[in-house]
Amino acid sequence: MNLAAMDPTTYDAQLTAKRIKLEQAFAQFETPSVEVFASEPAHYRMRAEFRIWHEGDDLYYYMFDKVLNDKVRCDQYLPASALINQMMAALIAELKPNHSLRHKLFQVDFLSTLSGEILVSLLYHRQLDDQWRSEAAALKARLSSQFKVNIIGRARKQKIDLDKDFVVESLQVNDKVFHYKQIENSFTQPNAKVAIKMLEWAIDVTQHSQGDLLELYCGNGNFSIALAQNFNRVLATELAKPSVDAAQYNIEVNNIDNLQIIRMSAEEFSDAMAKKRSFRRLEGIDLDSYVCNTIFVDPPRAGIDPATLELVQGYERILYISCNPDTLKDNLQQLNQTHKVTRFALFDQFPYTDHMETGVLLERR
């Protein structure tokens, strides 16, 4: 965190600097003009994590400022959603006088939605007992008069859900509303309004597509569910079981009937497509029946591994969302040999940081 950089009056200038840096970094690939999608300058993060500082009877949230090299008290937090800021104040007022709930509490995580739900995770350096459960249930009841809230308690090898461990987000994407189950402690796009812009951009660049879509690293189905409208069928892979379970829920709640999720890594799928290995998880799925002219990838920060990159290169069109411009640039060194970048976008998921979320559409030369 860098508190000094979090100044909404400088947001536009900081975003312009990011765009220039991105253009310069990718100039060798002769990319088209960068499409820039700005964030709200404040209250844009739908999740936030805070450490807890105990000082006598006082109790407060803090973060570590890497520039000041010190902890900074956070009674409110400009990047966090308005809902998180409201909950921060209400929760700390409840925790301060309650010995059972504050005892050895060291962290609080918030996950909120545009649809008005919020999940609060309380993390402890002690095992949680029946008294904690009783006090937490009473806390939830009191907070429920103001919030659509659920509470989770966590300790070493222990997790207590008072009700459920997820929220359901609703995103208005063009003329449709998509509903997404977002599970506590699983990856979700933190900036919901920019996430909407990412979905709308991905839908736009894949309009009038022919055939089917293959997606690797699909998470909770965020992109594949929205993109299903542009393809005959969608085949998507994801390794993390909680994300796969959420994706199946999201497919059902959004009434998507042309999307198949497979629980396997991108590397495993590459082996399956190359017929190097067979997998029981693929029983009943005829990979050869899919006519995937387009592949969508949203890899982790490490980028795409060499075997999967070779697989990706075999498709006519490649839609690549990247959370790390350095590994995207490395991957483009190979992809650029056979494909040309025809759309290029910067999504400002993380204002006031150096982080750049990018999107590229590549089409075979």
Curated annotation (Swiss-Prot):
GO terms for molecular function: rRNA binding; tRNA (uracil(54)-C5)-methyltransferase activity, S-adenosyl methionine-dependent; tRNA binding. The keyword Mitochondrion does not apply. S-adenosyl-L-methionine binds at Q189, Y217, N222, E238, D298. Its EC number is 2.1.1.-, 2.1.1.35. GO terms for cellular component: cytosol. Keywords: Methyltransferase, S-adenosyl-L-methionine, Transferase, tRNA processing. The active site is at C323 (nucleophile), E357 (proton acceptor). Belongs to the class I-like SAM-binding methyltransferase superfamily. RNA M5U methyltransferase family. TrmA subfamily. PANTHER family: TRNA/TMRNA (URACIL-C(5))-METHYLTRANSFERASE, TRNA_TMRNA (URACIL-C(5))-METHYLTRANSFERASE. This is tRNA/tmRNA (uracil-C(5))-methyltransferase. It comes from Shewanella sp. (strain MR-4). The lineage of its organism: Bacteria, Pseudomonadati, Pseudomonadota, Gammaproteobacteria, Alteromonadales.
